[in-house]
Design a protein with these regions (language model features):
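Cysteine-centered motifs
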Residues: 87-89
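Tryptophan (W) side chains
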Residues: 17-20
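Formylglycine-dependent sulfatase
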Residues: 99, 104-107, 113, 119-616, ...
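Ser/Thr-rich, low-complexity intrinsically disordered segments
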Residues: 50, 64-81
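Intrinsically disordered, low-complexity proline-rich regions
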Residues: 6-9, 22-39, 43-47, 55-60
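Low-complexity, intrinsically disordered or signal/transmembrane-proximal segments
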Residues: 8, 13-14, 35-38, 61-63, ...
Length: 658
């Protein structure tokens, strides 16, 4: 059926058209013919004649309903929204011409004006889908972002991350479901728990039959890209452009592979954080500007071994950072897992690889040699200028250390100070990168319709409990930073305290793009939290599961439940050699690309630990540092039953296979 103007119309609009006065039909025909070509023609418009917004909407409808139906639907939607507005305007002209008393004409005006205004307001709220800029670091702790107000960050501020927080929302209760790099990335891309996507441990490979959220965004009309650290043991899926590091990547002069050349890596001169940012901006400059974009910027930094950019190597050389309150923790009130880990600043932070003191090499010790080769793997990549900067800072510092002949707690304090100094110097470059990206958005008028997300793949220990690294379900590891800016949707300077998990990121991106969330995704969009008010039907607890034992750091397998106040953890599994014998050992990067079990055991990565099967319970309100395991204590029976029931429910509903 066609309208009087020659365009397609629904039956209801056609019948209404015939009832309108001739003068009204004449005005609509004249206006639509001169200003609205969609309404004044007998056939749908060519794609080239559509506005970018219309084209984006058609692309989305194509994905959902098919090409022919989509173009018809979008064209009719535009026509339907405009007809009431045009009618109001034309009827107003008709009334003015009518031979009626002035007071009657005036009494009719408010209704027409309100009708036209409401229609126009509704039209203005229909905005283009937002661009998505997702920035993720590797092992960035909340304690080193000054917006969170920790003692370390007060001495090493992050002004650009603070700027992002002022523009948007700071999330105080964001957590991961498995505090380990590759599993966390797999969770991001699939929106699934580790046991669901297949990437439970570092050495495993993700189930590539699982759909990545990037594939769904791409089909829905987004142009998609990822730059920096991928580390997923598979080809990037659903990306129009990628420029990614090989494996873990190097801080200096790293190798990248790019779109269409997966597996073919080329070295690029420079610092990884700067290069990754350069490639992100290059994508923004050359992208298809008729489409919204989703850009993932994944930094290697601040992953171990914390190599600062050459110009910032001595940035915090004279700063004395405070020791955490729990630095000298003896784990007396915890189970065996807290004592048998291998991630202590005093014993396990490597003097050569981590603290850059090659002068301490002991050629007769396997661990010392392994540490030396790991450091040289980075140093030998330096250009002459980079090597000069490295030697100028570290050689005098190391000389002072050796002359001081520190021992005991004084040596441990030296290790801590220099670990933190290198770590926050690496973060300084990350913060500058965030500033560059925010500046680009503002300079190119993209900031108003771009949601910017900053997070980390997990938290990290900055000396709490005497540790570095992550893995445990304890707060510093499970807890991860999250800052989101979305002008017009998130109030500036707002804070969210409700529980968020990284399984929520993929559903959020899909919701922002108007794409239906697949049923198998267990997370939920966090858009309702953007309003800044407490969402009553929000989740009350989270599930966590760490699988990667036995391997580096010897953190035992465990799962658990965290509520707003309590945390229940179950440590389980066979120890040491028995786990290896049952083929639970995953080959991991070592001194020769992939180490063997024997080589790793020689450098004390494995011990003949005992089998474990025990629980820990913490009241985070009265014991935020998790120093006192109250499992089994009198008065905790009710909360223990409640959490045990919830843990069993999670395992059953999620079909956890361990």
């Amino acid at each position: 059926m066609r309208s009087a103007t020659g365009g397609h119309a629904t039956r209801s609009h056609h019948s209404k058209w015939r009832k309108w006065p001739p003068e009204v039909r004449e005005v609509i025909s004249r206006v639509s013919g001169s200003h609205l070509p969609h309404l004044g023609r007998s056939s749908p418009p060519n794609r080239e004649e559509l506005s970018p917004t219309d084209r984006e909407e058609i692309d989305r409808q194509k994905y959902r309903k098919g090409t022919r139906r989509a173009e018809k639907t979008v064209t009719n939607e535009r026509r339907t929204r405009m007809i009431p507005y045009l009618c109001s305007c034309s009827i107003l002209l008709y009334i003015i011409k009518m031979n009626l008393p002035t007071h009657i004409k005036l009494s009719m005006l408010p209704t027409l004006v309100l009708s036209a205004t409401a229609t126009k307001a509704a039209e203005q709220t229909t905005q283009a889908r937002p661009n998505i800029l997702y920035i993720m670091c590797d092992d960035h702790s909340m304690q080193t972002i000054s917006a969170y107000g920790s003692p370390i960050s007060r001495l090493a501020p992050t002004p650009h991350l603070d700027r992002l927080a002022r523009r948007g929302m700071l999330f105080n209760s964001c957590f991961v479901e498995n505090s380990l790099s590759t599993p966390s990335r797999a969770c991001l891309m699939t929106g699934l728990y580790s046991h669901q996507n297949g990437q439970r441990q570092l050495g495993e490979g993700i189930d590539t039959t699982r759909v990545f959220f990037s594939e769904l965004l791409q089909k829905a009309g987004y142009t998609t890209a990822v730059v920096g650290k991928w580390h997923m043991h598979c080809r990037p899926k659903g990306f129009d452009f990628y420029h990614i590091l090989r494996g873990q990547g190097h801080y200096y002069n790293p190798v990248f592979c790019t779109t269409g050349q997966y597996g073919h890596y080329k070295e690029e001169t420079g610092y990884a954080t700067t290069l990754t940012t350069d490639h992100a901006i290059r994508f923004l400059e050359h992208r298809d500007k008729s489409k919204p974009f989703c850009l993932l910027v994944h930094h290697k930094a601040p992953h171990r071994n914390w190599m600062p950019e050459e110009k910032y190597m001595n940035l915090y050389a004279d700063v004395e950072f405070p020791l955490p309150d729990t630095f000298w923790d003896d784990y007396a009130t915890r189970g065996s897992a807290a004592r048998t880990q291998k991630m202590r600043v005093d014993d396990d932070l490597r003097m050569i690889q981590d603290l850059k003191v090659p002068e301490t090499l002991d050629a007769t010790d396997a661990e010392s040699l392994d540490s030396y080769y790991a450091l040289m793997g980075e140093v030998n990549r330096f250009t002459p200028q980079q090597r000069l900067a490295f030697d100028r800072y570290y050689m005098p510092r190391n000389k002072r250390l050796l002359e001081a002949k520190l021992t005991g707690r004084e040596l441990v304090k030296w290790k801590y100070q220099n670990y933190i100094r290198d770590y926050v110097a690496v973060i300084h470059s990350v913060d500058e990168s965030v500033g560059r990206l925010l500046d680009y958005l503002e300079q190119h008028d993209l900031d108003k319709n771009t949601i910017v997300i900053y997070t980390s793949d997990q938290g990290f220990y900055m000396g709490e409990h005497g540790w570095f690294d992550k893995r445990f379900m304890y707060e510093e590891s499970m807890h991860t930073p999250l800052i989101i800016s979305f002008p017009g949707h998130i109030k500036e300077g707002s804070v969210c305290h409700q529980l968020v998990q990284n399984i929520d990121f993929a559903p959020t991106f899909l919701s922002l793009a108007g794409v239906k969330q697949p049923k198998e995704m267990p997370g939920r969009t966090i858009e309702p939290l953007f309003a800044g008010t407490t969402v009553k039907n929000w989740r009350k607890d989270l599930y966590y599961h760490y699988y990667d034992y036995p391997t580096y750091h010897l953190v035992r397998k465990h799962d658990g439940v965290r509520t707003e106040r309590y945390k229940l953890i179950h440590f389980y599994g066979k120890g040491g050699d028995r786990a290896v014998q049952e083929n639970k050992f995953q080959r991991m990067p070592g001194t020769s690309e992939y180490g063997t079990y024997q080589a790793l055991k020689a450098i004390h990565y494995f011990r003949d630990d005992a089998d474990v099967d025990y629980y820990e319970l913490y009241d985070l309100q009265t014991d935020p540092n998790e120093l006192h395991n109250i499992y089994g204590q009198k008065g905790t029976e009710a909360i223990t039953r409640q959490l045990m029931k919830r843990l069993r429910q999670y395992r059953r509903e999620l079909r956890v296979d361990e």
